Amino acid sequence: MAFSSGFPFGFFNELVPVYLRSRGTSLELIGLASWASLPWALKFLWAPLVDRVGSRRSWIVACQVGFAAVLAAFVLAEPGGTPFFVLLFAFVALSATQDIAVDASTIELTTKDELGPANGVRVTLYRLAMIAAGGVMVGLSAALGWNRLFLLAAGLFLVLAVVNLRLPTAQRAPAANEPLLEPVRELLASPGIAGVVLFVLLFKLGDLALTPMVKPFWLDAGYSVEQIGWVQTTLGVGASIVGALAGGALTARLGTFRALWMLGGAQALSNLGYYAAATAGAPPGLMYGAAVIEQFTQGLGTAAFLAFLMSLCSRRHAATQFALLSALYRVAGIGAASVSGFLTARSGYATYFLITFALALPGFFFLPAVRRALAARGASA
């Protein structure tokens, strides 16, 4: 399930910027394409439907069939045109719906003590899927062509749909007689929720602001699509897998609170790697080092962050509450990413990467609220 969640995310964040830039799309339009990721932020609006109707497995399989249809349709769409962005929006909407079911299944099938290690494994599979989408597919694009790759990806999702039909689905207590907004009310009534909301909004901001401009930076620095696919994405995402496993283990060992500030601090500092590379003229050593370090620390921080978000959710309302929490940081990230192209075009890559480091810092001011919230829920702090 984690693999099928990671592929769409890798497709959107790793492959699409390379595809658009290699076809001559402007930095401004690539940045604005971040708005197509809005369904990831708004998925809490239909999460109650996923909570109440059907099984987790049925939602996942239906979305995977939808992925196959949309990927096949990309063959007919001009890159950067309106039909392309409509299809991209539909692709993300399917991904967001699938994520609701996958996230809820993870919460329902694990105990709180298992969340750290479970999310380490989950992020690992997620990152492997990102390698498939953003590394293998990008690396093969010159040899096979983009249209053939889209059709191959469509076939992959049909295979995944068949595989997922055989997976177990968690049993959950019915909530049909509860008010529709009960999951939201329960979450908002939690102790210290205001500080928690601000932390969730800001923790991943620097990371999400950085992502849309990384691949254009590689292309504009003179690196080939093959190098981006096989080195920047595959090597980098491979490092993030190691980071995710280490992050899951460290979260279990350190406790969620200490993992958040220690691993989150490493995640923030890693943005300076791309700043150094841009300042020095993008030499291979610094570029490869920046990719590996940024992805490794992203894996560290993400494992701790997911464990924290899941510790805030009740099992009964897992889909809705996790969707609402994840929407918070995605909304902030979309806002930052949407202006990334404009800022980069006007200030240059080096200055923009320095800005993303600054954006990663404000969330740490709200860690005391996080500690209180974890203590109130009996989670490890």
Which residues are covered by each model-predicted region?
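C-terminal membrane-cytosol helix-exit motif in multi-pass small-molecule transporters
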Residues: 154-173, 366-371
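C-terminal transmembrane helical hairpin of 12-TM major facilitator-type secondary transporters
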Residues: 258-305
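Juxtamembrane intracellular "pre-TM" segments in multi-pass secondary transporters
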Residues: 169-198
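Helix-loop boundary and gating motifs at the non-cytosolic
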Residues: 1-40, 194-199, 203-217, 229
